[in-house]
Amino acid sequence: MEINFKVLSKPIRGSFPSFSPKVSSGASRNKICFPSQHSTGLKFGSQERSWDISSTPKSRVRKDERMKHSSAISAVLTDDNSTMAPLEEDVKTENIGLLNLDPTLEPYLDHFRHRMKRYVDQKMLIEKYEGPLEEFAQGYLKFGFNREDGCIVYREWAPAAQEDEVIGDFNGWNGSNHMMEKDQFGVWSIRIPDVDSKPVIPHNSRVKFRFKHGNGVWVDRIPAWIKYATADATKFAAPYDGVYWDPPPSERYHFKYPRPPKPRAPRIYEAHVGMSSSEPRVNSYREFADDVLPRIKANNYNTVQLMAIMEHSYYGSFGYHVTNFFAVSSRYGNPEDLKYLIDKAHSLGLQVLVDVVHSHASNNVTDGLNGFDIGQGSQESYFHAGERGYHKLWDSRLFNYANWEVLRFLLSNLRWWLEEYNFDGFRFDGITSMLYVHHGINMGFTGNYNEYFSEATDVDAVVYLMLANNLIHKIFPDATVIAEDVSGMPGLGRPVSEGGIGFDYRLAMAIPDKWIDYLKNKNDEDWSMKEVTSSLTNRRYTEKCIAYAESHDQSIVGDKTIAFLLMDKEMYSGMSCLTDASPVVDRGIALHKMIHFFTMALGGEGYLNFMGNEFGHPEWIDFPREGNNWSYDKCRRQWNLADSEHLRYKFMNAFDRAMNSLDEKFSFLASGKQIVSSMDDDNKVVVFERGDLVFVFNFHPKNTYEGYKVGCDLPGKYRVALDSDAWEFGGHGRTGHDVDHFTSPEGIPGVPETNFNGRQIPSKCCLLREHVWLITELMNACQKLKITRQTFVVSYYQQPISRRVTRNLKIRYLQISVTLTNACQKLKFTRQTFLVSYYQQPILRRVTRKLKDSLSTNIST
């Protein structure tokens, strides 16, 4: 079958350059075949390079024979007029495996070679002077407060300071007896011996770092590596203080449960601990663990993504203006409480990711990292000097990723969260700001490759992200690392070894924009199935995506959730099950289910939902602030709405649970098979296959179709596996579930095109049908193909592995008899377990030879 590809004439804002298919027509259906994992992309933009690699500044490491592994090593940047050393010839083209996947990147080979060389050189320098990257990323064992040989040792990098001392409750905030010494790398240190075998600084006591400016002014700052910071809750807008956290063994939390296995496809529940209470107050880590985690598990999510964990002095920043990078947010509890939460999640089989903000830092001076910037140059600061060090839209500071101590600080920060708290991975926030020197400000990315690989690329930041992903996966190979990038930079989600940046997943950020646009600006009759489907499939298929219809971004004040866009004020009065649903509520609930399921099923290789949106939480999020009289009323989750038996919120919650259960059962998100067979703008119907499931969506506001035939790839018998119109999901029960549907061959002779009679497809409804596997003359097929049954199964389910198993052969030998489902029901286990036990015998003794023989011979005509 001929496959034609095209580039969207008007790329979606923020969308990924993609392999965008054109439909090729057949006699009985249209079928879209997406490129396989090893397919290449299309050419975007000009082939000419418009950048000069020699303009990128490089870093030089100051060498000294007295350098020791335990000492701090400071990187000194050259000025912006410095030139880059010539590229060495040993960086070969074949080392950039990314170009083999996408040959249209070939014109940018020099760029990839340059950044790969920078990455290799930086890593080699670290290993030369500090040891392996994993040891370099243990800076928290040296910097900040640590116990060493009967002493408390405190170290701080502050090369521009003139004099330093440590102050706190332990010395009455008078540091004259605790002055610090500075080494040649700008690291200040002090050793405070124990007195009577007890630490001089008590556990849970306040501490700060006091230093003198070059102009003679003394200032107090929270230590950069502090592990806990608190503010006086009895005072309004009280400043934060660092806290020395070293609990005795009896007060430490000890993890009891191992990390759960990495899921084949993450189904992520994005959550904010503080606003997770049903009451208008700040919730705690332990309350979240005991009350909210069971809800997440009950809805069959396998991953929790926690926002706002790193300490941030301004609650309303949603946690994205971090002040203390190694400290847990004290609003919700202390470090041991967070460990309890993570351990509880692991006991439920849930992975836990943390939002990590390394793209910028809070502009706060008294309680943030910005307080260490006293006007010095980039060589002596965590941030770029001058205008380059400020993000004018976010009002925040920007890291200098070429600085040695910045690399130590940020890489150590990642290892700290992984090892101290047992997190299972990260979501890197706002990395578009990191990838480009313009930070994405006033940029509308169109997909032209010149936008990604030019002098606008911040290679220092790219190298840091490559180092970060290399480190994370070395420490914890099963970590899940997700990138939030609106630009769609190619290679972001490919391994570092291929020349990529190394993330496991990227967020599909264009999808929610499309839904919001449709809900705000288009009537139901004007929805384009082709346009919506293109938005969901417009991605690089060699890089995995996390799809979502809405996240916390769509929930904040000034915006509206999908449920609120659909039902608005009727959510206050029309959600009772004791009265008939109004047309607005009926439409709203139906489309809420369809939009989220459509996004999940077709939009990526993982799925994300923000806390409360699964049941259509009304209204918006508004953190306490002066403008709302510091109210917490809109900064909570009303779980009682989903729990109430007489409110319609329960229907959306039940459907969300069923969506996730479906992937748990069939693993369609992890399937490489994705075929869109129909995008009917007139009838408002979309039909596609994911794995061995057939999805049918009818977005028409009125039309119900009788005897509607849809295309499918596999012949045989199908039955309904999920129906959004079912009574238990608040629907009208217009589709029967007790009827099996058999395919019938249609189309061009010799081409195995099949259809099954969909009988009825109600309006505003989505149906999912599963293929009922039948055990046929599989042995005969294997004998004719001269392959083993195991080879046949592998080649069939993970196509294409064996080219001998052609589609025609599969169709011919899978005209089947006894249903696998019936067999599983008799044996009382899942189909996957049956396949494993049947084809790799003997694994389960319950599957006896007699039973297998009876199944194989029970052939129905």
UniProtKB/Swiss-Prot annotation:
> GO BP, one example?
glycogen biosynthetic process
Pathway(s) served = Glycan biosynthesis; starch biosynthesis
Pfam family name, one: Alpha-amylase_C
For the protein in the UniProt heading, the enzyme class is: transferase
Q: Which residues form the active site?
A: D429 (nucleophile), E484 (proton donor)
Record-linked InterPro entries: A-amylase/branching_C (IPR006048), Branching_enzy (IPR037439), Glyco_hydro_13_cat_dom (IPR006047), Glyco_hydro_13_N (IPR004193), Glyco_hydro_b (IPR013780), Glycoside_hydrolase_SF (IPR017853), Ig-like_fold (IPR013783), Ig_E-set (IPR014756)
The reply on keyword NAD is no
Cleaved signal peptide residues: none
Coiled-coil annotated spans: none
Q: What EC number(s) has UniProt assigned to this enzyme?
A: 2.4.1.18
Q: Which domain of life is it from?
A: Eukaryota
Q: Which GO terms describe its cellular component?
A: amyloplast; chloroplast; cytoplasm
Keyword Mitochondrion part of the UniProt annotation: no
Checking SMART domains in the record gives: Aamy
Cellular compartment(s): Plastid, Chloroplast; Plastid, Amyloplast
Q: Which UniProt keywords apply?
A: Amyloplast, Chloroplast, Glycosyltransferase, Plastid, Starch biosynthesis, Transferase
Among CDD domains, the record links this protein to:
AmyAc_bac_euk_BE, E_set_GBE_euk_N
Q: Could you tell me one molecular function GO term of this UniProt entry? A: 1,4-alpha-glucan branching enzyme activity
Annotated residues for binding of (1,4-alpha-D-glucosyl)n? W173, K208
According to UniProt, residues marked as the site described as Transition state stabilizer are: D553
Q: PANTHER family from the entry?
A: 1,4-ALPHA-GLUCAN-BRANCHING ENZYME, 1,4-ALPHA-GLUCAN-BRANCHING ENZYME, CHLOROPLASTIC_AMYLOPLASTIC
**What does the subunit comment say?**
Monomer.
Q: What is the similarity comment for this entry?
A: Belongs to the glycosyl hydrolase 13 family. GlgB subfamily.
Q: What is this protein called?
A: 1,4-alpha-glucan-branching enzyme
